Regions:
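Glycine-rich phosphate/diphosphate-binding loop of Rossmann-like nucleotide-binding domains
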Residues: 1-22, 133-224
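A structured beta-alpha segment of the ubiquitous adenosine-cofactor-binding alpha/beta core
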Residues: 31-46, 53-54, 200-252
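Rossmann-fold NAD(P)-binding glycine/threonine-rich loop
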Residues: 74-103, 240-270
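Generic hydrophobic/aromatic pocket-lining and core-packing "Φ" positions
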Residues: 24, 59, 81, 121, ...
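Glycine/serine-rich phosphate-binding loop and adjoining beta1-alpha1 elements at the start
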Residues: 56-146
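An N-terminal-biased, well-structured beta-alpha scaffold segment characteristic
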Residues: 1-83, 87
Length: 270
């Protein structure tokens, strides 16, 4: 409705709303024109709004001088930028919106990260072999699950809150010591590294850590791995591939039946 008030005609691929329980009729009633295929949508639209950036199969469908609003990750996707440049496409990279109060209403990255953090715990729970919360039964005692969340940004904090509410013992690590208060306020334990320099960067983001810091970090993770049932990694560095924090060495130290959920997989994985 807000877009239509600006004078735009809205188009939607048929069936696109079904995973969110919105039928084509719901959109038609709201004045949206339904098109039969994604190809037709690309052909008939001047402005494309989508969550993920254009896939390789979609590059050929882009029209000259088309406008795309999406997550682009320009620092990691030079080939995509080159392809868009050849098409003379105007791009708004939603992942590049600064973390400031004035831009908060446009912070699509944080809203998606919040969903991802919640969903990470739900998916881990569906694969885990027992309840998150501890139980005392006539047959004996079942200990609560121990969950480690690496990275306490929006996704990490959402995962911490969800896991805590489900009765798990939650530990969290972040290279930025200033997030300790947020983690502890949610009932989780903050794993602190005794180090003179940290990984705090500008705008609340992390920055690449020193070799000495990484060495201490790996030592901490080696201590935690045998105890932890579920690891959820969320660490990202703007404009760079995701840092490698939980390699095969850590996985091998974990108990049989343990779960690893890597929310940074799209950017190279933690």
């Amino acid at each position: 409705k807000q877009i239509q008030k600006l004078g735009y005609t809205c188009l939607l691929e048929t069936g696109a709303g079904l995973p969110s329980n919105f039928s084509d009729k719901d959109y038609k009633d709201a004045g949206v024109r339904i098109v039969k295929s994604a190809s037709q949508l690309w052909k008939d639209s001047e402005v494309i709004l989508k969550v993920r950036g254009p896939e390789k199969s979609e590059i050929s469908k882009i029209q000259p001088n088309q406008h795309i609003i999406s997550f682009i990750w320009p620092g990691q996707n030079k080939s995509l930028l080159d392809s868009l440049n050849k098409k003379k496409t105007t791009v708004q990279a939603m992942d590049m919106i600064p973390r400031i109060s004035r831009a908060q209403k446009m912070d699509a990255l944080s809203s998606m990260a919040n969903i991802a953090g919640y969903r990470a715990v739900i998916e881990a729970g569906s694969q885990f072999g027992r309840f998150f919360t501890g139980q005392i039964t006539a047959a004996g005692k079942v200990p609560p699950a121990k969950i480690l969340v690496i990275g306490a940004g929006v996704a990490g904090l959402a995962a911490i809150g969800t896991a805590q509410s489900m009765g798990a013992i939650v530990r969290a690590f972040d290279v930025r010591p200033e997030v300790a208060e947020q983690i502890e306020s949610m009932g989780a334990e903050f794993l602190m590294l005794d180090f003179t320099s940290d990984g705090s960067g500008e705008g609340g983001y992390a920055k690449p850590a020193s070799k000495e810091f990484i060495k201490k970090e790996m030592e901490l993770f080696r201590e935690q791995a045998p105890e932890i049932d579920i690891v959820i990694t969320t660490a990202l560095i703007p404009g760079m591939p995701a840092p490698k924090l939980w390699p095969k060495e850590m996985v091998d130290l974990m108990k049989p039946g343990s779960i690893v959920v890597d929310l940074a997989a799209e950017q190279g994985g933690n």
